[in-house]
Amino acid sequence: MEIGTPLFEGAKKLLWLGGGELGKEMVIEAQRMGIETVVVDRYDMAPAMHVAHRKYVVNMLDGNAIKSIIKKENPDAIITEIEAINTDALLELESEGYKVIPNAKAVKICMNRIELRKLAAEKVKVPTTQYGFAENPEEVKKICKDIGYPCIIKPEMSSSGHGHEVVYNESEVEQKFKEAITHARGKSEQVIVEEYVKIDRELTVLTYRYLDDKGVVTKTITPIEHQRPSDVYYYVESWHPSTVDKDIIERAQEYATRVVNELGGFGIFGVEIIVSGNRVLFSEVSPRPHDTGLVTMASLDINEFQIHVRSALGLPTPEVKIVSPAAAHVILANNEGWAPKFLNVEKALQIPGVQIRLFGKPSTYYKRRMGVVLATGNTVEEAKEKARKAASLVLVT
């Protein structure tokens, strides 16, 4: 492969749809490899725009606007970084010869919980929670009666906990159904109703596909473990490697491989697995680097962002090694504001083995993720303790 020089004829070019903190790290990795970078998002000064060669601000659900930019830029590959995009436009662009990472169909399926559950549970037959699909409250009631209360209602267009509602009895169904549909990450007409299980452990199995001289290769990385409070949809901390039993790791990696191979394409996928008692259950998958995988910037010799960029360019990543036990803990805003400032960074960095990534988001709102602390240690527990302490010191004003 030949890689040219950015901004000159012959340059390799990647275009991101979405410019958040995950996109920023991908753009940085691409810049290190001499790639020309373009970022598109719904608001100006998104984190990845700070480090890209060019930027565009458009409605990400406007298919015509997306297609116009891509045809103007003519990138070597299109990388999706967010869920709220026009997936039909991606399918159309792909049919015209544009390369979508991982592929347009995978992006569309991963955004739709119903289609993803059909693929995972019914097509490749990996274990999941008991479930049913519903278009109205009456259908929800029937499914909950069959499965048993409590149940969880999730809108078909959702991810990372958005619009998830726990239903404890029949009297709550009408209101919870309405709330689930209202808080979807796009237009949703159906919901998936799942059994409520006690989650003992939550894992992310980073699974990636790349092309070498022998064909397509699929590999998994030792699982990341993560935690999110029960009352919020976002993750708070992750650590790597997970300390779950070997049997659980093997099952989790097997299920992740089966799902990702069915989705196809190239790049890294964040496959979420839940452990409940002796059950190891597939939950969902992101067709891109995963937020819990921010920890790989400290734990791996080749982080998830570089792996994704390599795969997008048709480059191999034959081996990934853990270089240290590590943990990541988010830095959250506590109020609404503009042009935030960060206090006590110097105190946090006095802790050995700690790094801080501030994302550069131009505005804040309650519990918005504004940065992350990365920490290494002799053990995962030591790294977690360092990350928690450092994150508690940093204040967002």
Swiss-Prot record:
Homodimer. Its EC number is 6.3.1.21. One of its GO terms (biological process) is 'de novo' IMP biosynthetic process. SUPFAM superfamilies: Glutathione synthetase ATP-binding domain-like (SSF56059), PreATP-grasp domain (SSF52440). Pathway: Purine metabolism; IMP biosynthesis via de novo pathway; N(2)-formyl-N(1)-(5-phospho-D-ribosyl)glycinamide from N(1)-(5-phospho-D-ribosyl)glycinamide (formate route): step 1/1. GO terms for molecular function: ATP binding; magnesium ion binding; phosphoribosylglycinamide formyltransferase 2 activity; phosphoribosylglycinamide formyltransferase activity. Belongs to the PurK/PurT family. The keyword Magnesium applies. Involved in the de novo purine biosynthesis. Catalyzes the transfer of formate to 5-phospho-ribosyl-glycinamide (GAR), producing 5-phospho-ribosyl-N-formylglycinamide (FGAR). Formate is provided by PurU via hydrolysis of 10-formyl-tetrahydrofolate. Coiled coil: none annotated. Keywords: ATP-binding, Ligase, Magnesium, Metal-binding, Nucleotide-binding, Purine biosynthesis. This is Formate-dependent phosphoribosylglycinamide formyltransferase. N(1)-(5-phospho-beta-D-ribosyl)glycinamide binds at E21, L22, E81, D291, K361, R368, R369. Residues 118-313 form the ATP-grasp domain. It catalyses: N(1)-(5-phospho-beta-D-ribosyl)glycinamide + formate + ATP = N(2)-formyl-N(1)-(5-phospho-beta-D-ribosyl)glycinamide + ADP + phosphate + H(+). NCBIfam families: PRK09288.1. Mg(2+) binds at E272, E284. ATP binds at R113, K154, E194, E195, Y196, V197, E202. GO terms for cellular component: cytosol.
